């Protein structure tokens, strides 16, 4: 009787689920018409900008290509490449035609790309020239044609296809179909039901093997209309898209929500190092920043921590009234560094370091932390920055339901389970995995462990798959220990593993900082890490004591959302 009791506890804020009334495809038809002359997409560092009208015209050209090739609704089209205007255009051309888009992260290895393209049964592939050069044509025999994300030219066509010939005559085809020119009145996309699958999102997750998440128009509309209702972005505002668009988080808000409301999207198109990002923020001056903890934590560690750790600063921060003035100066400096115009910074995709969260809250920096997963396209919970509770992962959305698999969901950690508008249809061609991830009564098992409060705020403790059970029966969440260790001197990344019933910390040191200070010697490194281990064990419980720190030679391999692929390191032996 546990689950019905839990449901009663949350009945006061859960709404009944019903199909999102706004049609996902029509959101973009309406946006193109209403924002025809406004700037839509700009590739960072380039002069060219597509207006909403020009994007609609490019989509019309691709639709003519699809029609020429007798592409059917429900056929799959893969896209792999960096964030660019044409990436966005290819995505929207696919879904507004009624085909299913299959975005692939550009840092996936060729064998993974082959697997996804083949498993999804993709007909066409849009990609960059250099990525195509590294793929094996013979391994992708199901593809009819491949198109460049640089200029949409045909890079490859299967024997017997005449795609290249049609592409050369595209202007003539446009004149034939739109003899008076292409205008907003010519946009009339098929109103495909929101129930239809429109996206297959493959992710390696933390189990090491990709599953194709079937996302419907309703799932996408749920995320986008939530962004519209809460006014995350408005017509004429600006965003900088630097998270990979093939990942659900960046795609939903930097791209899909932004395009639905008439926002100007600048696509970074390069690796978002802190130096590149700061320059781009200064130039673009975005009205909203969507990011992951890794970016914010690097800014904190490289910019803020050295400042507040100075002896004079520590002294000043202990003086009443003066501390508030200093915090205000730090806040202003940070806001200015990020462009100065944003309403808030939304952080998601992985766990945030509690020390960083507490400091940002203390200086009243406008940030919030959301929670989601690919299977929810991705949003589960969010609260605006002025309502955000430090330590939480936001408040459950009004179009979602949540329950905790626990006898006392307010106080005792249990698995977080959700249902609602954003929850996927299942895994493509994988009924077994679909059955495993849903409960018998239809709730999605997130695999995350946490609690919830009376107002619907979610508090995440860790992953059920990573939790370690101590010898005395205590639950150990390695992420909580790692967050403390990562704040210590010269620790760039860490990973807690269990070895012979003891906890061991794998650490990738900050060699760059060690080199700059002339401290990169085995003796110095051992001294620093011994001190870190001693200080770490003072901060954790008796059952969480770490037996040793073992240095790791390279950065840890990560998933698309920048979580460490833990399964690769569980069997790491002693040095």
Tell me what each language-model feature is.
Residues 27-51, 548:
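AMP-dependent adenylate-forming
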Residues 36-37, 167-202, 209, 232-238:
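Conserved pre-ATP/AMP-binding loop-to-beta segment of ANL
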Residues 40-84, 88, 92, 109-114, ...:
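Conserved AMP-binding/adenylate-forming core of the ANL superfamily
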Residues 51-53, 189, 198-224:
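Conserved AMP-binding A3 loop
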Residues 69, 96-175, 501:
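Structural core segment of the AMP-binding/adenylate-forming
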Residues 108, 125, 420, 425-426, ...:
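AMP-binding/adenylate-forming catalytic core of the ANL superfamily
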Residues 221-238, 245-332, 341, 366:
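Conserved AMP-binding/adenylation subdomain of ANL enzymes
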Residues 396, 403, 410-411, 415-470:
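Conserved ATP-binding/catalytic segment of the ANL
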């Amino acid at each position: 009787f546990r689950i019905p009791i839990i449901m009663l506890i949350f009945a006061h804020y859960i709404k009944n689920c019903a199909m999102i009334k706004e049609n996902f495809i029509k959101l973009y038809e309406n946006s193109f018409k209403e924002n025809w002359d406004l700037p839509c997409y700009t590739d960072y560092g380039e002069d060219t900008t597509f207006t909403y009208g020009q994007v609609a015209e490019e989509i019309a050209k691709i639709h003519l290509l699809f029609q020429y090739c007798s592409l059917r609704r429900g056929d799959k089209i893969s896209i792999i490449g960096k964030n660019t205007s044409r990436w966005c255009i290819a995505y929207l051309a696919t879904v507004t035609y009624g085909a299913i888009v299959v975005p692939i992260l550009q840092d996936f290895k060729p064998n993974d790309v082959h697997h996804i393209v083949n498993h999804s049964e993709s007909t066409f592939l849009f990609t960059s020239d250099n990525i195509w050069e590294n793929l094996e044509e013979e391994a992708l025999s199901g593809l009819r044609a491949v198109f460049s994300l640089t200029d949409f030219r045909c890079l490859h066509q299967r024997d017997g296809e005449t795609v290249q010939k049609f592409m050369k005559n595209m202007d003539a085809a446009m004149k034939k179909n739109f003899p008076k020119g292409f205008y907003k009145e010519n946009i009339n996309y098929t109103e495909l039901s929101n129930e239809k699958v429109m996206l297959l999102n493959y992710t390696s997750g933390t189990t090491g093997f990709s599953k194709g998440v079937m996302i419907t128009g309703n799932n996408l509309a749920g995320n986008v209309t939530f962004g519209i209702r809460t006014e995350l972005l408005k017509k004429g505002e600006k965003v900088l898209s630097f998270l990979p668009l093939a990942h659900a988080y960046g795609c939903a808000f930097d791209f899909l929500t932004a395009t639905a409301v008439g926002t100007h999207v600048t696509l970074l198109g390069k690796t978002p190092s802190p130096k590149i990002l700061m320059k781009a923020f200064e130039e673009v001056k975005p009205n909203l920043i969507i990011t992951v903890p890794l970016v914010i934590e690097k800014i904190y560690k490289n910019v803020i921590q050295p400042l507040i750790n100075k002896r004079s600063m520590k002294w000043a921060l202990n003086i009443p009234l003066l501390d508030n003035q200093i915090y205000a100066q730090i806040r202003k400096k940070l806001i200015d560094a990020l462009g100065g115009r944003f309403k808030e910074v939304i952080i998601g995709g992985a766990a945030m370091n509690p020390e960083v969260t507490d400091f940002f809250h203390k200086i009243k920096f406008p940030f919030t932390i959301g929670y989601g997963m690919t299977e929810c396209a991705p949003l589960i919970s969010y609260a605006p920055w002025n309502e955000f509770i430090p330590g939480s992962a936001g408040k459950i959305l009004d179009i979602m339901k949540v329950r905790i698999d626990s006898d006392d969901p307010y106080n005792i950690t249990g698995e977080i389970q959700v249902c609602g508008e954003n929850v996927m249809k299942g895994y493509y061609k994988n009924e077994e995995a679909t059955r495993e991830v849903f409960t018998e009564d239809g709730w999605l098992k997130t695999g995350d462990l946490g609690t919830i409060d009376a107002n619907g705020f979610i508090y995440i403790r860790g992953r059920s798959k990573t939790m370690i059970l101590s010898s005395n029966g205590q639950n150990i969440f390695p992420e909580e220990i790692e967050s403390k260790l990562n704040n210590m001197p010269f620790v760039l990344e860490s990973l807690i593993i269990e070895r012979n019933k003891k906890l061991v910390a794998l650490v990738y040191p900050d060699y760059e900082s060690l080199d700059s200070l002339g401290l990169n010697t085995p003796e110095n490194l051992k001294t620093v890490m011994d001190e870190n281990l001693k200080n770490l064990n003072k901060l954790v419980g008796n059952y969480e004591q770490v037996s040793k720190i073992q240095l790791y030679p390279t950065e840890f391999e990560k998933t698309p959302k920048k979580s460490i692929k833990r399964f690769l390191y569980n069997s790491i032996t002693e040095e």
